[in-house]
Amino acid sequence: MVSEKTMAERVLALMGRPNNIRNIGIIAHIHHGKTTLTDNLLAGAGMLSEELAGDAMFTWWHEQEREREMTIYGAAVSMVHEYEGDDYLINLIDTPGHVEFGGEVTRAVRAIDGAVVVVDFVDGIMPQTETVLKQALREYVKPVLFINKVDRAIKELQLPPNKIMERLAEIVVGVNDLIERYAPEEFKDKWKVSVQNGTVAFGSALHNWALSVPYMQKTGIGFKQIAEIYNTAADAKEIRRRVWEIAPLYRVVLDMVVRHLPSPKEAQKYRVPKLWHGDLNSKYGKAMLEADPNGPAVAVVTKVIVDKTSKQETAIARVWSGTIRRGMEVWLLNANKKVRLQQVGVFKGIQKIQIEEAKAGNIIAISGVRDLQSGETIVEPEPDGSKPNIPPFEAIKHIFDPVVTKAIEPKDPRDLPKLIEVLKLIQKEDPTLKVEIDQESGQILISGLGDLHLEIVEYRIKNDFKVDIITSNPIVVYRESVKGQAGPVEGKSPNKLNKFYITVEKMPDELYWKLREKLLKGELPEGKIKKMNEDIIKHLMSLGFTREEAQRCKVIYRENMFFDMTRGIIHIGEVIDMVMDAFMQVMDHGPIAWEPCIGLIVKLTDAQLHEDAIHRGPGQVIPAVREAIKLAMKDAGLVLYEPVQVILVDVPPDYIGDVTALINSRRGAILDIQTEEDRALIKAKVPVREMIGFTDTLRSATSGRGVWYLVDQVYEPVPRELFDQIVREIRQRKGLPLDADIV
């Protein structure tokens, strides 16, 4: 192993050479070998002994990860690789493959410019491969491909070389189909991977070898020599030693990374315009486009880690321009406050090496600041110390919404303040976790992406932060909407001196999906539109709205839209903000069961306002608009939607009957069944309400041999025969009237 001092010195020397930096992530489906690959890359860079690689799981910094044998939290590590006589700094982030931790992938891809996509030779492309690659491409991250577990083809499946080549070609075609589908238009062809040009490598992370065409051409080492070692070696240890000598994995993969993935200098030219919507001709825009270390400092936090004993927070951040220095004062644009950066460091796995400064293009660790959140933009103050007038980077978007909620309380009521503090800390680390305190009942609700997500949060509260808790059974989050359209419906203020006229209609499905995609890409803002501009108008018109409608769009909230279509109403400008607040309140709590609304277009078409401002304050305007929206929704035909998960179940063929019966017993529908010799893939749709406890039931139905993966999440109307029962359950739980209308 290289001594820490030597490694630290080499890292520091390279931090000022942006052309020699590669910020990369390893992304893949769960259990396809990402973390083992990471360990072997570290061993090759001299940061982990070769004997330990693969067993050490260097980036698994949380005991939950070791127990479950999967990466939950994206860890960061810096290492040095020599290529063609020059040193390169590789900043690497290991990301989870389990879909319930997809938020970690979303945040990690903001920090990186390139990704090594790992695909299992036997499994091929799986649902999460598609999800994580889609997330990376959406953030303008360039991929290369590593096909792992080729050792299984030789030892286990005993495939002849021509069959192995056929399978490799199949995987390459599949990955390129995904790149064609999800890559930005200008990179659809440029970013396709190819065995010939060296953007594809294949090998075994377990046995620590890899091959690529450039490596084979350079060394004369080929598949034949590897197969020979497998056929003659006495045991796995001998295989590892001998293949390492002729085709070391780290050299082949990191050579591919250096040669084919972009430096920050190159990547920021096309990434900054997509991720930051400020003036590219300003001093900030120019500095970020060039990754200029002498420009004003701008960095973005992509993750916050909380130490379970000291509660100290460490933020992982990408420096986009300028130089971040220890002890410097900076502005946090989202939090709107000035703070001092106490410590700056780089990661060596879990360990931090303290440094004095970090220049543009680097991934760093910042400690000693309590107000950093994932997605925060850090900016150097203006020369007079004031806050720069620039927008923050666009918010980091997550593909799936939280759909499962639990009520949580401390066993000992005296631990309540501690529990609230712990939840705030965990939420900083994991923004996909939603924490709400019901203002009326005082009940604390935590919402996550599924059963497993909440289980891990509970484990951390109990074991890391030592708070004993009681949790309720999981509760599913529903959505409210309408069947058709209605209005204008009148809403009167309590003093009867103001009237508002509202129409409500269901968003057409095609429009809804296009809107969702634009929100995920950051092309449209979420919330009140503070400043309408030509870009927003164009994106709204591309959804099918007229120019006039687009100009009058005031709010996009929870995938619902609000338009002010009034003309010539005196004083409307003074109350429109309250009208928007009322709209957002109803979108948070709909009329059926106080669940959030989805897919609605709400328009204010007319209003009659009292001339005296004292008679049209929030206490008059907000109830009137709320009433009008809820009555219009009722007239348009109320619908309750439930979250439905599209899943893929992977089982031996003998269990197809048991699994289809299990899915059918949970109101599921089979969409597709594909069978191979030793496995069957069953694609199905199952309501989230019925998915609770599914993992354990599947395990017992298949003698522990069945696993399932989340492919997608959609909302579908609750069946008519269950509507009354579900509404009653929700209302009862929330302490709402069981039969009366909630308006």
Curated annotation (Swiss-Prot):
List of residues binding GTP: 28-35, 94-98, 148-151
Any one GO cellular component localisation term in the record: cytosol
Modified residues (Diphthamide): 615
PROSITE patterns found in the cross-reference section: G_TR_2
Superkingdom in the source lineage: Archaea
Subcellular location: Cytoplasm
tr-type G domain boundaries: 19-265
GO molecular function per UniProt: GTP binding; GTPase activity; translation elongation factor activity
Membrane-traversing stretches: none
InterPro entries assigned: EFG_II (IPR041095), EFG_III/V (IPR035647), EFG_V-like (IPR000640), EFTu-like_2 (IPR004161), P-loop_NTPase (IPR027417), Ribosomal_Su5_D2-typ_SF (IPR020568), Ribsml_uS5_D2-typ_fold_subgr (IPR014721), Small_GTP-bd (IPR005225)
Disulfide bonds: none
Keywords: Cytoplasm, Elongation factor, GTP-binding, Nucleotide-binding, Protein biosynthesis
Function in brief: Catalyzes the GTP-dependent ribosomal translocation step during translation elongation. During this step, the ribosome changes from the pre-translocational (PRE) to the post-translocational (POST) state as the newly formed A-site-bound peptidyl-tRNA and P-site-bound deacylated tRNA move to the P and E sites, respectively. Catalyzes the coordinated movement of the two tRNA molecules, the mRNA and conformational changes in the ribosome.
Family that this chain belongs to: Belongs to the TRAFAC class translation factor GTPase superfamily. Classic translation factor GTPase family. EF-G/EF-2 subfamily.
Protein name stated in the entry: Elongation factor 2
Lineage, highest ranks first: Archaea, Nanobdellota, Candidatus Nanoarchaeia, Nanoarchaeales, Nanoarchaeaceae
Recorded name of the encoding gene: fusA
